Amino acid sequence: LICGTRGSADAGLNLLLFVPLGFLVASRGRGPASSLLVGLAVSGLIEGWQLFLAGRHAGLSDLVWNSSGAFVGAALGAAGFVAVALMVGGSLMVPWQTDADYWGQWRPDLGSMPQYEGEVLEASLNDQPFPSYRLPAEPPHRRLLEVPWELAGTIVAGGPPRSVSPILSIYDRNRQEIMLLGAHRTDLVYRERTLARALRFDSPDVRILGGFLDIRAGDTVTVSASGGEELCLRIDDTERCGVGVTPGRSWGLLYYLEGPSESFRRTVDFLWLVALFMPIGFFSLGMRGWSMGAGIGLGGLGAAVLVTPMVTPGLAEIVACICGLGLGALTARVFEWVADKPTGLTESV
């Protein structure tokens, strides 16, 4: 049911696709069991149809996760689903190191990512030398990343890479990425192994946008990432603390878009929250129901920020939640108006 290195992300997408069907069935007074049956029927028709399409493949896993999505939507309701989804998403961002031995790497040539064109002059981990081979500390090496920790390096900057290029990284003996400090275009990029990665979801990275913007190839600069009460990234005199993944970026657990610009990703952040909160407004009954649903959804967002590694959303993400709630309610009213509109036909006598 879960296959491949990002099998859970694919399963999550299939589940999410049918959650609105569960909302719809539940709004007609049916329970989760009925939603499950409807989900099975609809997904079964789709999978059966794909048997006759060239290049398409029907799968049992799609049937299971689609129908599960309908069940979850009916069981939790729109507001409950948003709250649970954000809490689960935040929990998946917990750092999750392995117990295997760790290897340090200076601008490694990994094949899956371009090699950084600059040069690493020196590097340290927790003020101790950080070599480009097996870390000399006594195992388990995961203790090296217990807070507080700092990975830092002095480098000769290279040209801006078109995709994420590691400058300093830590991999374990099983070739699993534990930590990466690198560059992408003019951004300083940091990412680490999280519970999401361990469970085969995608995992968003964290950046200093334009960190290399005023740095030319050949300049000597220092870069670092440190963890304690909050995550801090630094490039020369530019430091950002409290950085991390916001609720709006939680879509990256299912399908993270690394290549596009940050402005594009922020647009996706906005639309993702609008899409999450819109069903709350659409399926709420009256102002009281709308207020309760909004409270549950926004409460779930606040709880995720308080008790998980998610960081506080910006104003744009708060506006996106409110827009979703309002747009959902407006769409419901439009549907009601269309349904009640006279057809113009008169009854014959």
Stretches with model-predicted labels:
Residues 1-61, 67-349:
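Bulky hydrophobic segments
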